[in-house]
């Protein structure tokens, strides 16, 4: 894990994830479903390696992900030994329509623990759009994930379902484990203007920025800064603020309890663009 080296970088944190699983379970499909980022591997001269970058927004911080897929090659051990250096997370992928790919998870986990012990992992059941051909019951996969102590997702690159959500959850686990979430120390050198904006939006909700006695251009910048950077500390402390006016016409901020958003996507998510039977 690393932070950007200059304020001009387009991300706040950089994480390296490995996609691991048998061949033909759809790992390349997952990478191809990502529209942003580079697709050409810096090590394209090595066969059997797929590579993609993408940037996600996590608690207001921009997290750039480097995603590596070894494509289940027989020389996985040699490749993984090289690519596991500096890896912060592993995505275990199986095909829900291929029983053999699920039963091979123990073999992959053993190799991961041999070369990268203790690296955070999530279990991903791919090709949910083929649920009518399902060979791995969701309940069985969920029980297996609970036994491993990892988070479980079923995803569909075709429907763009749970792809970003699964990456975001693994990034959250990694950042919290290393205590590098946005409540920690600043991840880059800020300009004076950004420091001023950080101070203001840290105690002012975005919907109250319009009420501040500031020029309209500055208020607009503050709102954009607040939404893009996610610097409103109330989201992590479980607090919100409301503007109250006393009888002396002086405004003040008072704290109001709010419910923090769940760390995993809801089960009734309808973001997918196709019907899953």
UniProtKB/Swiss-Prot annotation:
Lipidation (S-palmitoyl cysteine): 269
Membrane topology label: Lipid-anchor
Gene Ontology CC terms: endosome; plasma membrane; synaptic vesicle
InterPro entries: P-loop_NTPase (IPR027417), Small_GTP-bd (IPR005225), Small_GTPase (IPR001806), Small_GTPase_Rab (IPR050305), SOCS_box (IPR001496), SOCS_box-like_dom_sf (IPR036036)
Main location: membrane
Coiled coil stretches, renumbered: none
Protein EC: 3.6.5.2
Molecular-function GO terms, alphabetical: GTP binding; GTPase activity
Keywords per UniProt: Cell membrane, GTP-binding, Hydrolase, Lipoprotein, Magnesium, Membrane, Metal-binding, Methylation, Nucleotide-binding, Palmitate, Prenylation, Ubl conjugation pathway
Comment field on protein domains: The SOCS box contains two defined motifs including the BC box that recruits and binds Elongin BC complex, and the Cul box which interacts with the Cullin family of proteins to form a ECS (Elongin-Cullin-SOCS-box protein) E3 ubiquitin ligase complex.
Function according to Swiss-Prot or TrEMBL: RAB40A small GTPase acts as substrate-recognition component of the ECS(RAB40A) E3 ubiquitin ligase complex which mediates the ubiquitination and subsequent proteasomal degradation of target proteins. The Rab40 subfamily belongs to the Rab family that are key regulators of intracellular membrane trafficking, from the formation of transport vesicles to their fusion with membranes.
The protein's name: Ras-related protein Rab-40A
Organism: Homo sapiens
Gene name, Swiss-Prot/TrEMBL: RAB40A
């Amino acid at each position: 894990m690393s932070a950007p080296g200059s304020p001009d970088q387009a991300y706040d944190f950089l994480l390296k994830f490995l996609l691991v699983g048998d061949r033909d379970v759809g790992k390349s499909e997952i990478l191809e479903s990502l529209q942003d980022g580079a697709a050409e591997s810096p090590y394209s001269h090595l066969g059997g390696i797929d590579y993609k970058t993408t940037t996600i927004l996590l608690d207001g911080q921009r997290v750039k992900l480097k995603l590596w897929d070894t494509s289940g090659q027989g020389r996985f051990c040699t490749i993984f030994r090289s690519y596991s250096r500096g890896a912060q997370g592993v995505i275990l992928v199986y095909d829900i329509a291929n029983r053999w790919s699920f039963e091979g998870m123990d073999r992959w986990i053993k190799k991961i623990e041999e070369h990268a012990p203790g690296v955070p992992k999530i279990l991903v059941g791919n090709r949910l759009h083929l649920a009518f051909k399902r060979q791995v019951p969701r309940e069985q996969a969920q029980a297996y994930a609970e036994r491993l102590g990892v988070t479980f997702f079923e995803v569909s690159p075709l429907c763009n379902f749970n792809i970003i959500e699964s990456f975001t959850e693994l990034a959250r686990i990694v950042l919290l484990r290393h205590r590098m979430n946005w409540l920690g120390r600043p991840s880059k050198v800020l300009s004076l203007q950004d420091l001023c904006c950080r101070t203001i939006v840290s105690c002012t909700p975005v919907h109250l920025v319009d009420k501040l006695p500031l020029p309209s251009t500055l208020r607009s910048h503050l709102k954009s800064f607040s939404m893009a950077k996610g610097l409103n500390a109330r989201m992590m402390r479980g607090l919100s603020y409301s503007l109250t006016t006393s009888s002396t016409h002086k405004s003040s901020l008072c704290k109001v309890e709010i419910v923090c958003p769940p760390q995993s996507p809801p089960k009734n998510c309808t973001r997918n663009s196709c019907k899953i039977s």
